[in-house]
Amino acid sequence: MAMFSWTSSEAINGMYIPSALLIFGTAIVKKEWLPYAVALAAILSGGKVFSNRQRKVLNPTEFQNFELKEKTIVSHNVAIYRFALPRPTDILGLPIGQHISLAATIEGQTKEIMRSYTPISSDQEAGYFDLLVKAYPQGNISKHLAGLRIGQTMKVRGPKGAMVYTPNMVKKIGMIAGGTGITPMLQIIKAIIRGRPRNGGNDTTQVDLIFANVNPDDILLKDELDQLAKEDDGFRVFYVLNNPPEGWEGGVGFVTPDMIRAKLPAAAPDTKVLICGPPPMVSAMKKATESLGFKKAGLVSKLEDQVFCF
């Protein structure tokens, strides 16, 4: 039998010893006081009992400061930024498919600048969130991030966005991503695979991804995507490059309707297409999907749209 000291501060089955002592002592003095003692003990110990539960920290209306914990260089202009949450057990509380806003005051700008990013981490990982960001010459927030030092903070607000993925919302999903447009796709892909029957879920959604980039070095997270495709026969990825290397077996040039027809599911009521990338690419993909029989994408995407643009 496990032994304990009445003066110990360790928890027993979620209740701290002083509370247990209060109940025991009350029961000895007068049994009818016992319910009140139990209630009081619950109040006294509540802070400890609930302190280890996961807490969602995002606020949709107010910016909060999060400290840069790590910075991993991916390429000459791409890095993964890891920001710490207030407590190790905290999670962002970001629905799958949604994104967050980052804000900063940039030198030379009269107003605070805001940009939206989708974390590549999920609420499965507590205590931090990761952002994959490419620094552009004219990108105010991306350049600001690139200049952040470990220990400095970034203002974050969210969640936001019309897309909220739920298991089996459609039978098939086709994805078209360009550059850092891969981030919301990866978030959804990983959620689907986590929810497979073999992992204790019921998600049987089939996913096909076309991922377009300029050069081989621009293919972000390729190793992770390849590993996911290897492990899950319900996920397939097809790479497209403007400047392919010798012996390249993927697509070449821009994403065309013929590529979409060959690599993504055909238009059907139980099929959805997700698009994310540079504005010119998104515009071209809207036209391409419409030409293949998908419903015309709206100016502002809604969750129920057959073609959804992030």
Curated annotation (Swiss-Prot):
One of its GO terms (biological process) is tRNA wobble base 5-methoxycarbonylmethyl-2-thiouridinylation. The keyword Flavoprotein applies. It is an enzyme of class 1 (oxidoreductase). It is a single-pass membrane protein. Keywords: FAD, Flavoprotein, Membrane, Mitochondrion, Mitochondrion outer membrane, NAD, Oxidoreductase, Transferase, Transmembrane, Transmembrane helix. One of its GO terms (molecular function) is NADH dehydrogenase activity. One of its GO terms (cellular component) is endoplasmic reticulum. It is found in: Mitochondrion outer membrane. FAD binds at residues 146-161, 172-209. Pathway: Protein modification; peptidyl-diphthamide biosynthesis. Residues 61-166 form the FAD-binding FR-type domain. NADH-dependent reductase for DPH3 and cytochrome b5. Required for the first step of diphthamide biosynthesis, a post-translational modification of histidine which occurs in elongation factor 2. DPH1 and DPH2 transfer a 3-amino-3-carboxypropyl (ACP) group from S-adenosyl-L-methionine (SAM) to a histidine residue, the reaction is assisted by a reduction system comprising DPH3 and a NADH-dependent reductase, predominantly CBR1. By reducing DPH3, also involved in the formation of the tRNA wobble base modification mcm5s 2U (5-methoxycarbonylmethyl-2-thiouridine), mediated by the elongator complex. PANTHER family: NADH-CYTOCHROME B5 REDUCTASE, NADH-CYTOCHROME B5 REDUCTASE-LIKE. Belongs to the flavoprotein pyridine nucleotide cytochrome reductase family. This is NADH-cytochrome b5 reductase 1. It comes from Ajellomyces capsulatus (strain NAm1 / WU24). The lineage of its organism: Eukaryota, Fungi, Dikarya, Ascomycota, Pezizomycotina. The gene is CBR1.
